[in-house]
């Protein structure tokens, strides 16, 4: 308990405190398995796309490599702490650690939302304007787009961090979640949280809603182009790919919108937890499966990398 007037120096995450020992053990095993699988898949994509393979020397694979890097950063920001709190009895996190975690969630989350929009635009140009693809999406443009996503993530993280911690914290320090989530933390501050929540809402329109509109618009144009030109078999394959991409993207955008585009805080923590789990765990795990492992060139690059590894083993003995 905090004494009246005392300044908060630490927070208590109570997301799993009410869970039984058996439930925490089950959640620990589940989250550890999902985290390990996600790290392995995204790590493999980073290795494959950064590996000097001429067939993967295109903007799309450059985007995929950075998407996997963002997913690794994003899931590492939250899951390791969750695993620790499922084992230990004290769920205390320092004020500085909470600020740091929130910054990286903001930074990486915003960068990924923007990058996914750029990736959708890349596919739009490649399919709808194939003859102009190289001039429009050159290597220089590709690097600038990725740099823009990272830059806006870094800058936006600073802005949202200031908005979240502009008021002092002298009240309750119990966070009803399994990590430091901005809307809940803001509700613990001394001042009126509505200004900060509205600022986050306005910011989310720019960094979440706008990329989502660009992404959906790009895929709608892709589908329209394919339906007018491709054969029936080509239509089915492209429709399946676009549908799977849109599904993952909508999961990310809608779950983030539900958590951050809610200035009146009408949703309780228990209702928000599934959405938080969706964009912190499920999306980073699904991205490599949907975007990379279904790609023929990625599969062939994995086979070539495995073949080179096997050939190198006898020489090292």
From Swiss-Prot:
Transmembrane segments: 26-46, 56-76, 101-121, 141-161, 199-218, 239-259, 273-293
Xref: PROSITE patterns: G_PROTEIN_RECEP_F1_1 (PS00237), G_PROTEIN_RECEP_F1_2 (PS50262)
Entry-linked InterPro entries: GPCR_Rhodpsn, GPCR_Rhodpsn_7TM, Olfact_rcpt
Signal peptide: none
Sugar-bearing residue positions: 4
Keywords: Cell membrane, Disulfide bond, G-protein coupled receptor, Glycoprotein, Membrane, Olfaction, Receptor, Sensory transduction, Transducer, Transmembrane, Transmembrane helix
Cited function: Odorant receptor.
Protein name: Olfactory receptor 10AD1
Organism annotation: Homo sapiens
Encoding gene, per UniProt annotation: OR10AD1
